[in-house]
Amino acid sequence: MKMATNGRFFTIGLVASWYSSNIGVLLLNKYLLSNYGFKYPIFLTMCHMTACSLLSYVAIAWLKMVPMQTIRSRVQFFKIAALSLVFCVSVVFGNISLRFLPVSFNQAIGATTPFFTAVFAYLMTRKKEAWLTYFTLVPVVTGVVIASGGEPSFHLFGFLMCIAATAARALKSVLQGILLSSEGEKLNSMNLLLYMAPIAVVLLLPATLIMEKNVVGITIALARDDFRIVWYLLFNSALAYLVNLTNFLVTNHTSALTLQVLGNAKGAVAVVVSILIFKNPVSVTGMLGYSLTVCGVILYSEAKKRNKN
């Protein structure tokens, strides 16, 4: 009985950490890029990936949280590098969109990931779902169209960046299923991050130097005036790793259905918290649109589950 209670408390603690890190990194990204005025999304993403590289190594090589899996061939390495590139694009574009859009609208667009996943799965693998499953994607897309029309802080460039980030996130999940499908090449998410994050740093470094010139000098100058920026960046980067760690642990300690429900609720919680903190204007139309999208995502998940059974 005591073991079961302890296990329940451990799972609740994990879920709370998962929610806190996910919502925390999202809100802090928004604060830094928009409110604080640190307008360097590529450099910010590079900080995240550097932290993920270092902390992944500590967690796997030193703390032995999961067994270390090795890359077995050059082909597997190039597959991971391709995934890393798509991963970079999704995170950078997502951070760019946060400069221009409120978190609430950003989350509404992000909820359309299943739509893009279904599209890419069909285009790349010819994998067809039941018609009912595709039908449930109609409210997902319709909701975002309605939310866009009713969004007081709508920004076209931010909207396009967010759509691109969402599409890239879906593309990564489909690509991962294709590229690392054989038993010999499968990596758990912790090991995949261990290899993807350093590749991401290598890809982001030239992009940062070319597109965000003298960002290191600007950050150092900024730190001289306000040292809090250093703590913000360090905490934000550590949170970015914690998102991946808690996501892995929650996936391992809960059922697929629980994870689905928690994932759908997480976006809604992020929306409410962001509105309370940033006090961005919201419209009834926008909230109705977002609600319709969330309902569509829940129906889509349910339809996919029934189709499997």
Swiss-Prot record:
TM ranges: 9-29, 42-62, 77-97, 100-120, 130-150, 154-174, 192-212, 229-249, 256-278, 282-301
A single GO cellular-component term on record: Golgi apparatus
Domain of life: Eukaryota
SUPFAM superfamilies from the UniProt entry: Multidrug resistance efflux transporter EmrE (SSF103481)
Keywords, in A-Z order: Membrane, Sugar transport, Transmembrane, Transmembrane helix, Transport
Statement: the UniProt record of this protein carries the keyword Transmembrane helix: yes
First-listed, main subcellular location of the protein, grouped into a coarse class: membrane
Compartment annotation: Membrane
Its membrane topology: Multi-pass membrane protein
Domain spans labelled EamA: 30-147
Stored Pfam families: TPT (PF03151)
Similarity field: Belongs to the TPT transporter family. TPT (TC 2.A.7.9) subfamily.
Protein name (database record): Probable sugar phosphate/phosphate translocator At5g05820
Biological source species: Arabidopsis thaliana (Mouse-ear cress)
